[in-house]
């Protein structure tokens, strides 16, 4: 009884164990194509020479400079004729000479222009002989062109560079400036009333020049300002007579001086 069970167990065990399967060597995998480097000869079809030639692919060629021309399959274009010793024969220089004249019967006479054609500016349009009037007209036109070119290039390319350097506004110029002298001379020519009753006399006219006070006038006005920032009408008339200024000029000077004093005090506070 036991023997039968053992035999049954051995049969079941042998049947449950899978037998190893052998994979043929030439099996193909359609979903996994073989990589290029796995092929036996991947680059043979792309090589210039299917067989290895040490004279062509060697690092140091043993056949000289002319050995490369010995392969017509590699150099099919313009191969020179090799001599028996493997050297390229020297080519004789060909001396090409231009024709002597236009009437020569040489086959290559049209390749080289004649000296007469080279002297003519436009061979296709110019006549054989130009008249003296045409030559004189051409000479006059050339002279006129040269004169106009010289006149043009004498001038500056940038017009603003031809003007004098800007020195500033005329009403800010010192006494030595010519523009300020002209404007002051025009204003000095006018006799302005001074003294009492000149509070409404306008000195600035259409010229819009700025009044330039002398050192003496500025000194006296500064002394008066330090005495009192606000000038009275009596003192204003006295200064007008003494400084040869109108009362309006003195009033405006004091207004500007008080504004300057306020700005200076604000700067000190900051």
Swiss-Prot record:
Its main location: nucleus. This is Homeobox protein pal-1. PROSITE patterns: HOMEOBOX_1, HOMEOBOX_2. Keywords: Activator, Centromere, Chromosome, Developmental protein, DNA-binding, Homeobox, Kinetochore, Nucleus, Transcription, Transcription regulation. Induction: By heat shock. Interacts with tir-1 and let-756. Disruption phenotype: Embryos shows disorganization of cell types and lack specification. Loss of V6 rays development in male tail. C and D blastomere derived muscle. One of its GO terms (molecular function) is RNA polymerase II transcription regulatory region sequence-specific DNA binding. Transcriptional activator. Interacts with promoter regions for tbx-8.9, tbx-9, elt-1, hnd-1, scrt-1, and vab-7 genes. Binds the sequence ATTTATGAC. Binds to the enhancer region of the hlh-1 gene promoter during embryonic body wall muscle development. Activates the gene for mab-5 in embryo development. Necessary for vab-7 expression in C blastomeres in the posterior of embryos. Required for posterior V6 neuroectoblast cell fate specification during postembryonic neurogenesis (patterning) which generates the characteristic ray lineage during male tail development. Residues 14-24, 101-130 have a biased composition (Low complexity). It comes from Caenorhabditis elegans. Residues 206-265 bind DNA. Fifth intron is thought to contain a regulatory element required for expression in postembryonic neuroblast V6 cells. 3'-UTR thought to inhibit self-translation in anterior blastomeres. It is found in: Nucleus; Chromosome, Centromere, Kinetochore; Chromosome. The keyword Chloroplast does not apply. Belongs to the Caudal homeobox family. Residues 1-24, 96-130, 175-201 are annotated as: Disordered. InterPro entries: Caudal_homeobox, HD, Homeobox_CS, Homeodomain-like_sf. GO terms for cellular component: condensed nuclear chromosome; kinetochore; nucleus. Pfam families: Homeodomain. PANTHER family: HOMEOBOX PROTEIN CDX (PTHR24332), HOMEOTIC PROTEIN CAUDAL (PTHR24332:SF9). One of its GO terms (biological process) is embryonic pattern specification. The keyword DNA-binding applies. It comes from the Eukaryota. SUPFAM superfamilies: Homeodomain-like (SSF46689). Blastomeres. Embryo. Oocytes.
């Amino acid at each position: 009884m036991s023997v039968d069970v053992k035999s049954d167990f051995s049969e079941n065990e042998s049947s449950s164990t899978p037998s190893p399967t052998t994979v043929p060597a030439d099996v193909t995998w359609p979903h996994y194509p073989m990589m290029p480097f796995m092929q036996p000869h991947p680059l043979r079809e792309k090589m210039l020479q299917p067989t290895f030639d040490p004279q062509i692919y060697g690092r140091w060629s043993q056949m000289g400079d002319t050995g490369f021309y010995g392969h017509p399959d590699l150099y099919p274009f313009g191969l020179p004729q090799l001599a028996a010793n493997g050297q390229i024969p020297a080519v004789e220089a060909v001396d090409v000479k231009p024709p002597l004249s236009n009437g020569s019967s040489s086959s290559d006479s049209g390749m080289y222009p004649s000296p007469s054609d080279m002297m003519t500016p436009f061979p296709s349009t110019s006549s054989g002989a130009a008249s003296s009037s045409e030559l004189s007209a051409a000479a006059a036109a050339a002279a006129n062109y040269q004169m106009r070119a010289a006149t043009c290039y004498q001038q500056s390319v940038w017009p603003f560079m031809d003007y004098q350097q800007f020195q500033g506004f005329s009403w800010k110029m010192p006494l030595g400036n010519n523009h300020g002298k002209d404007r002051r001379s025009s204003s000095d020519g006018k006799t302005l009333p001074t003294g009492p009753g000149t509070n409404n006399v306008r000195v600035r006219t259409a010229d819009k020049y700025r009044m330039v006070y002398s050192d003496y006038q500025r000194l006296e006005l500064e002394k008066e300002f330090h005495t009192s920032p606000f000038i009275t009408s009596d003192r204003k008339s006295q200064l007008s007579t003494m400084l040869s200024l109108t009362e309006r000029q003195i009033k405006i000077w004091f207004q500007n001086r008080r504004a300057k004093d306020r700005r200076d005090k604000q700067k000190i506070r900051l």
